Amino acid sequence: MHTLVFLSTRQVLQCQPAACQALPLLPRELFPLLFKVAFMDKKTLVLRELVHTWPFPLLSFQQLLQECAHCSRALLQERLSTESMQAVILGLTARIHTQETEAGTQPLCRKHALRVLDMTGLLDDGVEQDPETMSMWDCTAAVARTCIAQQQGGTAEPGLSPVPVEIRVDLRVNRASYTFLREALQSSVASPLRLCCRDLRAEDLPMRNTVALLQLLDAGCLRRIDLRFNNLGLRGLSVIIPHVARFQHLASLRLHYVHGDSRQPSVDGEDNFRYFLAQMGRFMCLRELSMGSSLLSGRLDQLLSTLQRPLESLELAFCALLPEDLRFLAQSSHAAHLKKLDLSGNDLSGNQLTPFQGLLQAVATTLLHLELTECQLADAQLLATLPTLTRCASLRYLGLYGNPLSMAGLKELLRDSVVQAELRTVVHPFPVDCYEGLPWPPPASVLLEASINEEKFARVEAELHQLLLASGRAHVLWTTDIYGRLAADYFSL
């Protein structure tokens, strides 16, 4: 829905040269809406000039591109246009260049000079990008190259120095982009464009490069560190963790593939693990911890006991958890604060079921997001757990993909979950009824790879839809799509 003000603004921007000439005559209060309309409609000349002459200290994508009173479209929930993103960057460099070459004349009022360009919060769903949209990798590269070019091509003359602009971004780095991102961070220290990272995600980066990058980041800006596919091991983790622990205001730490055999621990392995635990105790503000695909069998108590404050998000996917790990978590101070819990890939079907049910009871008051993908939960286990599960009254998201559930089990879940008024999304498996010749119990790999009978599944979907309609729950999404943007990030809960 668009207001008359929005439609009038869109009309004003139809002729870009005229709109650019008119900008100095327009009230500054119109600039936020002008920015959103120009960004949405790819009015790149206007967009560049808007950034060039921005009259406020802050230009924030999260503020300007969300749903507003004049336009219900939230651009940050979409992939952003490459043309529009590049226009913003060009407008910023033009602004700095103007200040450098015309320093003595002060063409831009320093009282209202732009101080912060906040480009954080861009959609990063991991899906292959449209060539006309900018991924997080593209954004990282574009901003980094701009900082490098600005430092190499600076032409400031004696007199009034340019007003520094802090560029806040979420950075994504891998082996291919590491070198120029490191150069950009080094260059920005003495540049009028100061690169400031809010969330860092490093994928498959060598240990020494990870450390070098961490040493260049501003401890006051960083909110999240996410190290993916690095297969660190305890030895590698003991090298990296002190460099991570200096960010004592870090809110989210995501570490993956930290391997170490807890069943046959070596002396060095134990020393490295104790050192890791000691460093984890330095974080004062940690709210989210993810240790996906890390071997934590029987060690969860050691890990969680070192933390200074209760967690609100805990991801322990494929961590080979034991019953005692689940019992400890249920009795810990973390349970009463957890909003998000991911136990995917841990077998909850045997002697772990009762401790798991106890854990659900402990987190029922606060839990919003529960992920149980590939947990070997068949109908019997699900039905036994439903009385506890439905006590999670605030639950919004339930992930059950990859579990051997039948249509009967799914229907029972749907009926019982009617009492969960906040539930909005259920990611369910293809029912075992839709497969042919499944071994029993079916391994998760078989459920993920085997072909299903499309005709049978179409009937299942239709029946589930009718049950949702009959129960007045048509607004709840039941889906088998595990690749959509359905799982909420902790910071959006």
Swiss-Prot record:
Provide one Gene Ontology cellular component.
Answer: cytoplasm
The yes or no answer to whether the keyword Cytoplasm is present is yes
LRR repeat boundaries on the chain: 111-146, 194-218, 219-246, 247-282, 283-307, 308-339, 340-360, 364-391, 392-416
State where it is primarily located. cytoplasm
Keyword Acetylation on entry: no
Q: Name one GO molecular function term.
A: kinase binding
Determine the domain of life of the protein's source: Eukaryota
Which Gene3D superfamilies did the record assign?
Ribonuclease Inhibitor
Compartment annotation: Cytoplasm
Q: Which keywords annotate this record?
A: Cytoplasm, Leucine-rich repeat, Repeat
Which GO annotations describe the biological process of this protein? Answer: negative regulation of NF-kappaB transcription factor activity; negative regulation of toll-like receptor signaling pathway
Q: Which Pfam families match?
A: LRR_6
* Summary of subunit composition and partner proteins: Interacts with IKBKB; disrupts IKBKB-IKBKG interaction preventing I-kappa-B-kinase (IKK) core complex formation and leading to a decrease of IKBKB phosphorylation and NF-kappaB activation. Interacts with CHUK.
What is the role of this chain? Negatively regulates Toll-like receptor-mediated NF-kappa-B signaling by disrupting IKK core complex formation through interaction with IKBKB.
Which family, according to the similarity comment? Belongs to the PRAME family. LRRC14 subfamily.
Protein's UniProt name: Leucine-rich repeat-containing protein 14
Q: What is the lineage of its organism?
A: Eukaryota, Metazoa, Chordata, Craniata, Vertebrata
Encoding gene (name): Lrrc14
